Amino acid sequence: MKEKNKHILVAMSGGVDSTVAAALLLAQGHQVSGVTMRVWDTEPLGDGREPAHIRDARKVAFDLGIPLHVVDLREEFLQQVVTPFCEEYLSGRTPNPCVLCNRVFKFSRLLREADRLGADALATGHYARIVEHDGLKVLAKGSNRQKDQSYFLFTLTQQQLQRVVFPLGEMSKEEVRTHAERLGLHVAQKGDSQDICFIPDGDYIGFLERQSHATDTEGSIVHVSGKRLGKHRGAYRFTVGQRRGLGIAWPEPLYVVAIDAAKKQVIVGEKEHLHVDRLVTTGTNWIVAQPQQPLQARCRIRYRHQEAPCTLVVLGNDRVEVRFDEPQSGVSPGQAAVFYDEDRVLGGGWIA
């Protein structure tokens, strides 16, 4: 978006990325407002006291000279992100709440907030780009491959892409920090968030037990051959691909290859049993036109996975079969599978 004097609402987390995104838009001559979501309080707060990320966002907004709007979404976030996250884990799947938050809140709820405030567009600090291809707005990888976040954005629609801006799409993290230092912003060296925002300590098991009242439901650890090898204290304590913490002896290293929550079984096997040559996605979203014929593409099955060559076959009812040229390991039901054509995101869905 190169036109001057646009009113752009920037989603601000109090971190360096969204702060620099706002600063860049200001430098381009846009009218900029900030918005911060209050979705989950991870620290005890006294009456009237705000979480640290909101305090940081208020300070950088003040430093930049822009208004900041705070939207309290705690109840909706509990219902639409946290509860599904817990339910997915307890059903034996490995959820990706960041993708869900992007779909439900950052690029839906905040676009409605932009409408309410009379803003023309919404900007975020994601490392991704929007490019033109065959007359469409298409999501593309950020220029800095180490920080590329396009994987988390596959649910964007054409309508949303018309109104979304990614100011950091051509930048590296080092360039972002240098720009923040040049502006004298106090968040210049603020650390990156490494965990799910509502589980900052990374203790998923403890969170599930506190939040969803998961109990130590005992079940069996079973080899792919059918041999029972031991017991566990809850299938939600395991994820596909896990090797450590199984607590069983076997001549060769064993990995979790599947979880059957209904039977309370954790199925384990040797490494070769992790390999699959195909998967099916549900809830598939196409950013480009849905292909009418099998399509050669590349598929990423987790954030740090190198996309693998594959053939996409549309099955109908938002389902797509992904047929890999070479078997892939660590395919976890509940995670996102995102389809690429070189740098461009074609779409993606949830691994069934």
Curated annotation (Swiss-Prot):
InterPro entries: MnmA-like (IPR004506), MnmA-like_C (IPR046885), MnmA-like_central (IPR046884), MnmA-like_central_sf (IPR023382), Rossmann-like_a/b/a_fold (IPR014729). GO terms for molecular function: ATP binding; tRNA binding; tRNA-uridine 2-sulfurtransferase activity. The record marks H126, Q335 as: Interaction with tRNA. GO terms for biological process: tRNA wobble position uridine thiolation. GO terms for cellular component: cytoplasm. ATP binds at A11, M12, S13, G14, G15, V16, D17, S18, M37, G125. It is found in: Cytoplasm. Disulfide bonds join C101-C197. It catalyses: S-sulfanyl-L-cysteinyl-[protein] + uridine(34) in tRNA + AH2 + ATP = 2-thiouridine(34) in tRNA + L-cysteinyl-[protein] + A + AMP + diphosphate + H(+). Its main location: cytoplasm. Residues 147-149, 302-303 are annotated as: Interaction with tRNA. It is an enzyme of class 2 (transferase). HAMAP family: tRNA_thiouridyl_MnmA. Catalyzes the 2-thiolation of uridine at the wobble position (U34) of tRNA, leading to the formation of s(2)U34. This is tRNA-specific 2-thiouridylase MnmA. The gene is mnmA.
